[in-house]
């Protein structure tokens, strides 16, 4: 959409007016006891709700004092390490089993898991001509926008879209979990064809394949993938499924659910939250940062040169001048992120299989150096370690997943957590979420038009 000269001048002028009138003195937040970002100075979130779905632990009580500990993550009370080890020992894919656990609170037996997989397969169908009429029309490079548009449009095909009974919401959630990968991959293919002039191919999912296998199958021209590729992607999905009720997109799920809104609107809102670069787009920043590092460091095996680049990042002298080392640190974890710890072993296997050992060694070096550099350069209130985003972008690049699908892959996993939290919010809370905002604007006398 083009803009007139008048429009451009107006926007430039009035944007400055907006900046002047929107700014609030930073000291007022501290003076009035406002928890910015709903977190205290140590990064601990304000207690806004209770949940049975997952638990994150980054500290423990020793001799009456709270001290940092290795990060722990529990899904429905089960340690994530044990869950991953459990399905890996059986040589099984974990997405469907852990989805069942998060939604229903119990680990399924063989009969229950078989039935659940059949239900997900039955739900893996889009309305007639939906791909052509909705997904492929007006293709966008931003696949998250494509997903949001598609999900809101799906509501038009649902005669009970606004019914928020448990049975209906569960049906809707299972359907959206099943079709979200299709909409994302088809959306990318549409963009790649109509914008990049590449070949267009639409592969239907195979009901006998796992979610990870189907994602790779639908994405690739020849539908081929190795077992290792599918298993590493499956692990990535499991590790990204759920992370408490306070992360931005899941809290959005609670907020919009509390208003009584329908499932399609709730998931669209969560997607809009996840789309933000401060939330779901972090792994893209890691990949871009690593590309910049390779351009600006002569010897990638030299720790001194790599450390110098990391310090430049913190001094806002490199990459995007934001002063951040992407993939390092987390709002909750300090000593370690268990998801990153689990993921690293699988990343290493894939890197060696793909001939990317040197790249893996570089990532490992940065994982070791960055916390030390940050501790030297910054005043920090807790430890810093690599988070799961640090390695996920590297994995997706090894799987030949395009950059446009990095955040949608996150969404394919996290929609499970959103669904579980929506069901929990509907069950337990009957009040709309409404935190307080205090006005710091002085009262003014009205000015007549001719006196302005």
What are these regions (language model features)?
Residues 1-452:
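Non-transmembrane, aqueous-exposed alpha-helical and coiled segments at domain scale
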